[in-house]
A protein has these predicted regions:
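A short, well-ordered alpha-helix in the C-terminal region of glycosyltransferases
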Residues: 296, 303-318
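Conserved catalytic-core segment of nucleotide-activated headgroup transferases in glycan assembly
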Residues: 10, 14-33, 145-151, 157-229
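N-terminal pre-catalytic "stem/leader" segment of glycosyltransferase-like enzymes
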Residues: 1-67, 401
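Donor nucleotide-sugar binding/catalytic pocket of nucleotide-sugar-dependent glycosyltransferases
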Residues: 116-152
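C-terminal amphipathic helix plus adjacent low-complexity
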Residues: 316-317, 321-408
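Conserved acidic donor-binding segment of nucleotide-sugar-dependent glycosyltransferases
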Residues: 274-277, 281-287, 296-302
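Membrane-proximal helix-turn-helix segments that form the acceptor-binding/catalytic region
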Residues: 73, 89, 101-120
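Nucleotide-sugar-dependent
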Residues: 91, 174, 219-257, 263-274
């Protein structure tokens, strides 16, 4: 390892695609390359003692007011903070499923505190750059990444159907309605020549021929399976409002990396990165425009192949994991500097406030579980439990990988 490798602690609300892509993947790679010493934990497990060992603390999508002491301890002790945000929670409807998780008044107040106090705020879209910039002068917009090492070559059979894919981790999905009339029309006309797949949300009842793939909670495993499936055309609808314009271009990165010709809503998330007719097709959010784009890519195999190749090249040149890691390392070095700070952090009182007795935590979970059952039903709650189990296992494996380098003096 170099003479000084910054000690970076990432405190995450949970493991999800955003935290995995933006924080876990690059930090683990930098740790294993000896450029930093990283420790990754969940905010429900974190302690100010973790901050006492850090030269930099990284948060991502954290909004829980009951864990505010973690941020406040870092600020009070002079440890720089990087806050990563790829969704505009200020624009979420508070009565939506995501709004109940991220956009209640107390959560938005906590988000404001994070954004105001951070040494650097990292965002992925121009609307979020403007929104965060009103609270903090140190905001940087970066391009997201995709790990091309996880992409597999599909075994494509000549003469088979053209495989279409719509993929999202949202189980309560409304964006698919944008293209559904066009897809239904195409499938009625083409029959077995077209094979449509939904990955994540279940397809609507009016499209019984659509094949369904369940959510894969481990993102690397998802990318391997997704890329190996041999999809040729990908659908990426997006609403034209402030919340959705604040998102990152994950679908372009995934489709491009996997050699899929994408059809994208013509909103700035995609129009800023997609070259129409070269790396994808940009379409208005109406049924006729989506139908024409679908028809064009199904009928024109040469255009389809050209877009697949050009999109893959675009991802390799601008969105690779290695590029993102170099940006992250630059940010770490700028925030930490070359001299490790010396400080004493009093953590005992804060630890006592944060760490509830195990029985108290279990009792607090009971009404939350009952409320989840009432709102979502058994199937959705079971899926949530599977997600928790998968995340717990993934976190344990991560910490095992990081432990040796982290514990070195």
């Amino acid at each position: 390892m170099p003479a000084f490798s910054p000690r970076v602690v990432a405190i995450l609300p949970r493991l999800c695609p955003s935290t995995w892509i933006n924080i876990v993947k690059p930090l683990v790679a930098l740790h294993e390359a000896g450029r930093v010493r990283a420790w990754i934990t969940l905010e429900s497990m974190a302690s100010p003692r973790d901050i006492g060992k850090a030269d930099l603390v990284v948060f991502c999508r954290n909004v829980r007011p009951d864990r505010a002491e973690l941020l406040r301890t870092a600020i009070a002790s002079g440890v720089p903070v990087l806050y990563d945000l790829d969704d505009n929670f200020f624009e979420l409807p508070p009565d939506s499923a995501s709004g109940r998780a991220f956009a209640q008044p107390e959560q938005l107040a906590m988000l404001t505190e994070y954004l105001t106090a951070a040494s650097l705020v990292r965002v992925y879209s121009r609307p979020l750059l403007a929104s965060a910039g009103r609270l903090n002068s140190h905001v940087e917009m970066v391009a997201g990444a995709v790990d091309l090492h996880q992409v597999r070559q599909p075994a494509k059979l000549p003469g088979g159907p053209v495989k279409l894919i719509y993929a999202t981790s949202r189980l309560d999905d409304s964006l698919g309605r944008i293209f559904l009339p066009a897809l239904r029309r195409l499938m009625d006309e083409e029959g077995p020549r077209v094979e449509a797949h939904f990955w994540g949300p279940r397809p609507p009842a009016e499209l019984p021929a659509v094949r369904h793939h369940g959510v894969v909670h481990n993102y690397d495993r998802f990318l391997r399976r997704f890329s190996a499936a041999g999809f040729e055309i990908g659908l990426a609808p997006l609403a034209d409002d402030v919340f959705h314009r604040s998102k990152t271009n994950t679908k372009f990165r995934e489709y491009g990396a996997c050699g899929i010709a994408g059809i994208y809503s013509d909103v700035e998330v995609y129009s800023d990165c997609v070259r129409h007719g070269e790396t994808g097709l940009l379409v208005a959010n109406d049924a006729e425009a989506w139908y024409r784009a679908l028809r064009q890519l199904v009928d024109d195999a040469n255009l389809r192949k050209k877009i697949q190749q050009q999109a893959r090249l675009e991802i390799e040149n601008h969105y690779s994991q290695e590029i993102f890691e170099s940006v992250f390392l630059r940010q770490i070095e700028q925030l930490v500097g070359r001299v490790r700070p010396q400080r004493i952090i009093e953590t005992h009182a804060v630890d006592a406030r944060l760490r509830q007795p195990r029985l108290a935590r279990l009792v607090r979970l009971i009404p939350q579980g009952i409320g989840c059952l009432r709102r979502k039903g058994w199937a959705r709650c079971w899926n949530a439990l599977r997600w928790i189990g998968s995340s717990s296992w993934s976190m344990a494996c991560l910490q095992w990988r990081l432990r040796k380098g982290w514990n070195e003096s």
